[in-house]
Amino acid sequence: MSIVEDARKGIITEEMKVVAAQEGVTEDFIRRGIASGQIVIPVSPYRKVKLCGIGGGLRTKVNCSVGTSTDIVDVDMEVEKVKAGERAGADTIMELSTGGDFVEIRRRCIEATTLSVGSVPLYQAFIEAARKDGAVIHMREDDLFRITEEQAKLGTNFMAIHTGVNRITLERLQRQGRHGGLCSRGGAFLTAWMLHNDKENPLYAEFDYLCEILKEHEVTLSTGNGMRAGAVHDATDRAQIQELIINAELGDRAHEMGIQVIVEGPGHVPLDQIETNVRLMKRMSGNKPFYMLGPIVTDIAPGYDDRVSAIGAAMSSMHGADFICYVTPAEHLALPNPEEVYEGVISSRIAAHVGDMIKLNKRDQDLAMGHARRDLDWEAQFNLAINPARARQIRNERASADADACTMCGDYCALKIANKVIKKLD
């Protein structure tokens, strides 16, 4: 029996108890959320993980993606990136390799973390076809489902599966065109395969069979966003919305079968369309957990896309997004290194917190920081910081002669002066 079926029968599982304690909500709140499809807890019968709940009424979670490319296959570096992401405070990891030995890389990454791990099975299926037969268009449908099951048995907790890329979606895309092209690797692979073979997407055509695999291995379905915009000028277009409609329908079907479901959202969205996207996706999916890929809010800042994404992620979280995929400074430029992974996670965690200050009224940490600064309590400030080591490092590198002040103001520290004046008035 799946965790969804347990929840429907009124059973509060150990996982629900753990997440309720983490989030400061009742155990029945979590149970009802899972039963209704508004909360998920990615689990696996094959490995124990640090549990996290994703969905309505819970803290916004951050995903850290790692993985090789065809140009850079360094398994040790990917393991370091996993560790860097976890050290920076990521809630989940996605392993998205496209180069090297897929099974070995995924196994190493899974073994390196206590966090829930996600994957995109079609990457391996299409790339193995290209290696064996010369092109992704030769991918065999049976291999796609076989690889999905193999990845589940490795202990994968959730999978991004591009169920909404079908003939109707492609027709919308072809009629309309795009300024920024098709940026989803999974969407591009499927588009090429479908057009060459004149066949429907097997993940859509055989959706019930896919769900049987996911349910058997208790894998959370994340409905992949193959038609997401790759440029802000393409945001919220017909192809994206068509895919959302299909994914929302299939998400309902999967949940009815006892599978936990996350709905993926777009990746390049201008600020004035973020609220629209979040509300539309929440409405159409029945308030299922919403996974925003960034989003990037302007296309002109390569090298700083972690900051660009943080702007979009904060607003997304504020309006109801539940899950944020981080973006690194290397986005659109290169495969990130461990340091860039760390920075990307920190940027996204800041954004998630900023959103939760509004969405969940979570402001206690900020209030405590205000008091610590007023009181010139540096140790408390470090402990309250989202990255204590970074805050401590900067202060120590440029320490003031006055232990209470910092080198920004030195002898003329406004807080110190004001505190003395107020004390005299008292």
Curated annotation (Swiss-Prot):
It catalyses: 5-amino-1-(5-phospho-beta-D-ribosyl)imidazole + S-adenosyl-L-methionine = 4-amino-2-methyl-5-(phosphooxymethyl)pyrimidine + CO + 5'-deoxyadenosine + formate + L-methionine + 3 H(+). Pathway: Cofactor biosynthesis; thiamine diphosphate biosynthesis. Zn(2+) binds at H268, H332. Its cofactor is [4Fe-4S] cluster. The keyword Iron-sulfur applies. GO terms for molecular function: 4 iron, 4 sulfur cluster binding; carbon-carbon lyase activity; zinc ion binding. The keyword Zinc applies. Binds 1 [4Fe-4S] cluster per subunit. The cluster is coordinated with 3 cysteines and an exchangeable S-adenosyl-L-methionine. It is an enzyme of class 4 (lyase). GO terms for biological process: thiamine biosynthetic process; thiamine diphosphate biosynthetic process. InterPro entries: ThiC, ThiC/Bza_core_dom, ThiC/BzaA/B. Disulfide bonds: none annotated. Keywords: 4Fe-4S, Iron, Iron-sulfur, Lyase, Metal-binding, S-adenosyl-L-methionine, Thiamine biosynthesis, Zinc. Substrate binds at M94, Y123, H162, S184, R185, G186, N225, G226, M227, R228, E264, Y291. [4Fe-4S] cluster binds at C406, C409, C413. Its EC number is 4.1.99.17. Catalyzes the synthesis of the hydroxymethylpyrimidine phosphate (HMP-P) moiety of thiamine from aminoimidazole ribotide (AIR) in a radical S-adenosyl-L-methionine (SAM)-dependent reaction. NCBIfam families: PRK13352.1, thiC. PANTHER family: PHOSPHOMETHYLPYRIMIDINE SYNTHASE, CHLOROPLASTIC, THIAMINE BIOSYNTHESIS PROTEIN THIC. Belongs to the ThiC family. This is Phosphomethylpyrimidine synthase. It comes from Methanospirillum hungatei JF-1 (strain ATCC 27890 / DSM 864 / NBRC 100397 / JF-1).
